[in-house]
Amino acid sequence: YEDHPMMPRLFALLLTSLLFCTELAAETTYQPFVLASINDRGLAEQTEATVSALESAGFRLAGHYPPLPNANVIVVTSPRLQAIAAQTERGGYAAGQRVSVTERAGKTEVSFVNPLYIQYAYRLGDGMEEIHELLSKTLGNMESFGTEKGRTAKKLGKYHYMVGMQRFDDPSELASFDSHEAALAAVERGLDRQGDGLTQVYRIDLPGKEQTVFGVGMKATGASDDEM
């Protein structure tokens, strides 16, 4: 068979196919959001239905808030999400999964933050694939969106908003305390302060670790043009 006249051509086609597949795998990109569904329900009814579906799938409601009159943001967590978040030093940011319900042109759109995007951006270990699959099964998965081209896992791991700003592993340290409990108390006192436009939306404590993530809502107070 080695001398068959078709063998060189078949070998070349096979090699080209392998190189093409390798290139595709290397260039897999991820978008930050997933459009789950478009529905005929009103905002309040669709929000309630979305929370109910998430709870039936094993998620727990951690908090929610309306950033706009026509939108609700739902934050859920679960033992599995918290276990994934606890694998790494700064994984706590991934303990809350955000889902949005937005009313637009007589329809309501349900979207969620892409767990795979979060996995690479927050440098987590494995596990967010199953969260992605569970959310897609529970809420739907029509398309991914959010950026023009998406980002590869490698680029997400090095991402920072602009030159001179911190990367994920170089955060700003705001204060230090004698204990984790003292730090938590100080944060909650600050978020309880009236008149500054900040509200605590949720708090998630990672089991077995001194790591807590707070979700904060911010409202413009009109005190400065810099707010916008």
Where are these regions (language model features)?
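Terminal, regulation- and interaction-focused segments at domain boundaries
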Residues: 27-68, 143-219
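Bacterial N-terminal signal peptides
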Residues: 12-21
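Primarily extracytoplasmic ectodomains and periplasmic/lumenal surface modules that are beta-strand-rich
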Residues: 60-61, 117-119
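Preference for solvent-exposed, low-hydrophobicity sequence contexts
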Residues: 220-227
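Sec/Tat signal peptide C-region and signal peptidase I cleavage site
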Residues: 22-26
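Mid-chain, structured segments of secreted extracytoplasmic proteins
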Residues: 72-114
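C-terminal partner/receptor-binding element of secreted or periplasmic proteins
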Residues: 118-154
